[in-house]
Regions:
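Conserved active-site segments centered on acidic
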Residues: 1-83, 157-163, 168-171
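Helix N-cap/beta->alpha junction signal
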Residues: 17, 90-91
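Phosphate-binding/catalytic loops
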Residues: 85, 91-171
Length: 171
């Protein structure tokens, strides 16, 4: 059976995208839906490949009972074929993802969107990068990510339910 695949992307894959990945996995676990999804995160840059998420983000997430376990990697051309959804954290990430897809002439079917577009209260155009700020910035970003990830899930939940009912996916 096929699974719905989601890739979260930020600049270095050590703050926003691994947090979004962990939040989405946590949401799926609470709903007992992890078997129907493949979830990952990546960065547009290569500076942090193989490293854990920023300790400030991990600590802020742990206070919410969210464990960030992934290691940083860089997005690549195969991702356009392997993921149904690629969700960028900001406009720069979005452009870099589009540029990579165009440069590699990928024929992949991935739907590339900005995660912020799924936020229930869209008063910001992007998920801000907390890397150079203080600890409070990480909590603020987690608030935005939780809201946006929930909105994304709600937007695709009907696809999941229809796919299960048609036997394309299993529970």
């Amino acid at each position: 059976m096929k699974k719905i695949s989601v890739l979260f992307v930020c600049l270095g894959n050590i703050c926003r995208s691994p947090a979004a990945e962990a939040i989405f996995l946590n949401l799926l676990e609470k709903r007992q839906l992890t078997d129907g999804f493949i979830v990952d995160s990546a960065g547009t840059g290569s500076w942090h490949i193989g490293k854990k998420a920023d300790s400030r983000m991990r600590i802020a997430a742990e206070r919410r009972d969210i464990n960030i376990l992934s290691r940083a990697r860089q997005i690549n051309s195969k991702d356009f074929d392997e993921f149904n959804y690629i969700l960028a954290m900001d406009n720069s990430n979005f452009r870099n993802i589009q540029d990579l897809k165009n440069r590699t002439a990928s024929t992949g079917f991935a739907s590339i969107k900005k995660l912020q577009d799924f936020r229930s209260v869209s008063n910001e155009q992007e998920v801000p990068d907390p890397y150079f700020g203080g600890d409070e910035g990480f909590d603020s970003v987690l608030d935005i990510l939780e809201d946006s990830v929930n909105g994304f899930f709600e937007s695709i939940s009907w696809i999941y339910l229809i796919s299960v009912s048609l036997g394309i996916l299993s529970l």
